[in-house]
Design a protein with these regions (language model features):
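Hydrophobic aliphatic residue packing
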Residues: 14-15, 102, 128, 170
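A general structural signal for well-ordered alpha-helical segments in protein cores
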Residues: 34, 61, 102, 121-122, ...
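Short beta-alpha connecting loops at secondary-structure transitions
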Residues: 22, 107-108, 145
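Carboxylate- and glycine-rich phosphate/diphosphate-binding segment that chelates Mg2+/Mn2+
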Residues: 2-97
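Glycine-rich phosphate/pyrophosphate-binding beta-alpha loops
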Residues: 89-121
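Gly/Pro-rich interdomain helix-loop hinge
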Residues: 112-172
Length: 172
């Protein structure tokens, strides 16, 4: 798989229209939504310094946690679908800070096995988080506080990810 990029390929404007996503099947909604979470999450955990991207990423994670289950369960929920479009756009903005292991593995595995990129990110997410715990724990604990999980620990956030995956039907 090759990534092709050039600044002239960037759009001049982006239109977020939730009505265009209403027919998306639940499994695809879940997988693409988890891809949005992975963009925000990996941007937050990137070791590079970009405080604005971090703030955007944290809010993008919150939006995914709140609205992805709704968008997946009720495909005609325009509010949930709109907020997921916003979370996705936030992730695309935030990942200028960088991505990480989830995407490095998902790109390669997707090319080898013709597997959906978002689904691979969702499957890999808890394992990559756990493997990188020592490097990202402080940021993840801050995110757990922002998400108001009731427990600001890395383990609580990891459980949040596992619970979200289970609710969405993501394989373990």
């Amino acid at each position: 798989k090759k990534i092709i990029f050039h600044p002239l390929m960037l759009p001049k404007a982006v239109v977020l229209d939730p009505e265009l996503t209403v027919g998306l099947p639940a499994k695809l909604t879940a997988a693409t939504g988890m891809d949005a979470l992975s963009h925000n999450l990996e941007a937050l955990c990137s070791p590079f310094y970009h405080p604005m991207a971090e703030g955007i990423a944290v809010e993008g994670c919150r939006l995914v946690g709140r609205y992805l289950p709704r968008a997946t369960a009720r495909g005609d929920d325009l509010e949930a679908r709109m907020q997921m479009l916003v979370a996705s756009a936030m992730g695309a903005t935030a990942f200028q800070k960088g991505l990480g292991g989830m995407h490095a593995l998902a790109h390669s595995l997707g090319a080898l096995y013709d597997a959906h990129h978002g689904l691979l990110n969702a499957i890999l997410m808890p394992y990559v988080l756990k493997r990188n715990q020592s490097a990202i724990e402080e940021r993840i604990c801050r995110l757990a506080r922002y998400l108001d999980l009731g427990d600001d620990s890395f383990e609580a956030f990891l459980q949040w990810v596992l619970d979200l995956r289970r609710e969405l039907g993501i394989p373990h």
